[in-house]
Design a protein with these regions (language model features):
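Glycine- and acidic-residue-enriched helix-capping/strand-helix junction motifs
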Residues: 67-79, 227-235
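Extracellular/periplasmic periplasmic-binding protein-like sensory domains
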Residues: 183, 298-404
Length: 497
């Protein structure tokens, strides 16, 4: 744990070697950190010629213990920060350095590392804030409180637990959150069950067998862990239970931590309310979400399959073709929540330089973001393979855009403030953030309300797990629409593609 802005790269060193896919992610994280540090050097060089330079801390759980796996989320965020650094260097305004801070496995060391960052900020007035934060857990909540007390701005990319940054009117003045809170996600899931699930139940039994029912007869919330310190899962489950009676026609949700036949049932909706962490050593080699899918495949016969909806905690699993291609998961179509619908709707455009250049030429949104990220992706695709495995992306990960927007908020704040003042300080950042809504690549970011939650758009989308080349379809935005214009192509139950 600790922080680094050059030289030292955080990586795993598992005794006896790692799974090839894990080793591949290690290589990706190592490459990303090295690229960030090279861009830091370039920022220093142009700052010597008079450009304003600001620093941000990227704070996440970058390493994992030997018994745990981690996925591409942290790499995606580092790559989003790289895009922000490069776009800034190509312009004429402020440039940005990124200090990488590691909170350890699952952010368990968030508090001591936060104290290190606070000490660093006391010595470095050009350090304007912290982005990332990785997990809605008790240690991260404590770290946010420490940053707030030290007047260090924080922009959390994916945190969503209710009250993670305090509760109104006592919410933390220096805390800002891009993702909607869990109460919003719970409402979207429940409205999806009320409005959209019946459309699937009305389809032929070849599409989904509901035993002749057109509404959910049972809602089961599967919560892999009841750890009260995991604020993401605990508040989401509480929200689902509390809000369900407000949705006419829905049965009262039941909560279980047990895997088995109780998950089965035609016209049963299983809500996966968890992450996709790997359990303690010796229990299973599968992550929690994969084990959930495997049990349903093994224990539920074809006329007894539940309708599956997963929270946004599985979005990184979905985005990893290798994870979806594991044996034993069956061929289920599942619905899941994404807070990256704006990027999902770009498809593969931002992954390939020719497509990104065409987007830039036509003046479409995301132009500079797309072209810069596409060049980074080509370097990632060229990384050495590990036992035949190479990196493969089908669309731009939502965390790439979230991290880019988080950094760009600080860059724009510096730019706007400098137009009529000297260089900005940390104390002025909140005032800049709340002054006006701001258009990011992930959507409209509006911190003008008292809660400092941008509430970027959530959507429920659908995907077939069995195919490593499948992409999400049938966007349900839950804003008075049945299905939105994207992403992808696929038959939706109202007949739209």
């Amino acid at each position: 744990m600790g922080y680094s802005d050059s030289g030292f790269v955080f990586t795993n060193r598992a005794p006896g070697g790692e799974d090839p896919l894990q080793a591949l992610q290690d290589e990706r994280l190592r490459f990303d950190q090295q690229q960030v540090f090279l861009l830091n050097q370039r920022a220093d060089q142009v700052a010597e010629n008079g450009r304003t330079e600001l620093s941000l801390v990227y704070f996440a759980g970058i390493t994992a213990s030997p018994d745990e796996n981690y996925d591409s989320g942290q790499a995606e965020e580092l790559e989003g920060l790289m895009v922000a650094q490069q776009v800034a260097l190509q312009g004429s305004g402020p440039v940005v350095k990124v200090i990488v801070a590691n909170g350890g496995s699952k952010m368990r060391e968030a508090v001591p590392v936060a104290r290190m960052i606070i000490a660093l900020a006391a010595r470095n007035p050009g350090l304007l804030g912290v982005v990332g934060l990785d997990r809605s857990i008790e240690q991260v909540k404590q770290a946010i409180g420490l940053f707030n007390a030290s007047e260090i701005p924080v922009v959390a990319t994916t945190l969503s637990a209710d009250g993670i940054g305090g509760t109104y009117p006592h919410n933390d003045h220096y805390y800002f959150q891009l993702s909607p809170s869990n109460i919003t996600e719970a409402g979207l899931i429940l409205r999806y069950i009320q409005e959209i699930v019946p459309r699937y139940f009305r389809q032929s039994r070849n599409e989904y067998y509901s035993a002749g029912q057109i509404q959910a007869r049972r809602i089961l919330i599967f919560q892999p862990s009841a750890d009260p310190g995991d604020l993401f899962t605990s508040t989401l489950v509480s929200d689902l239970k509390r809000e369900a009676p407000l949705f006419k026609g829905l049965p009262a949700p039941q909560v279980t931590q047990q895997l088995g036949t109780q998950l089965c049932g035609a016209a049963t909706v299983d809500i996966y309310a968890g992450r996709h962490d790997r359990p303690s050593a010796g229990i299973s080699q599968l992550d929690d979400f994969s084990e959930f899918l495997r049990i349903i495949e093994d224990d539920c016969h074809s006329a007894d399959k539940p309708f599956i909806i997963a929270d946004d905690g599985v979005s990184r699993f979905i985005a990893d073709p290798a994870a979806r291609d594991q044996s034993g998961l069956g061929e289920p179509e599942i619905s899941y929540v994404t807070n990256g619908i704006a990027l999902l709707n770009t498809g593969s455009r931002c992954l390939h330089t020719a497509a990104a250049a065409a987007a830039q030429g036509s003046g479409e949104p995301f132009s500079s973001f797309c072209t810069t990220y596409a060049a980074i992706v080509q370097k990632l695709f060229n990384l050495p393979k590990v036992q035949g495995y190479g990196l493969d992306f089908l669309w731009t990960g939502e965390r790439v855009g979230l991290a880019f927007d988080a950094a760009d908020l600080f860059i724009d704040a510096e730019t706007n403030f400098q137009s009529s003042h000297p260089a900005i300080g940390r104390a002025e950042i909140p005032g800049q953030f709340i002054s006006d809504p701001w258009q990011g690549v992930t959507g409209l970011i509006d911190f003008t309300t008292d809660l400092h939650i941008a509430s970027l758009p959530l959507a429920v989308v659908r995907i077939r797990i069995s195919s490593p080349t499948a992409t999400p379809t049938c966007e349900y935005p839950g804003q008075g629409q049945v299905f939105g214009p994207g992403p992808g192509t696929g038959r939706c139950p109202d007949g739209s593609d």
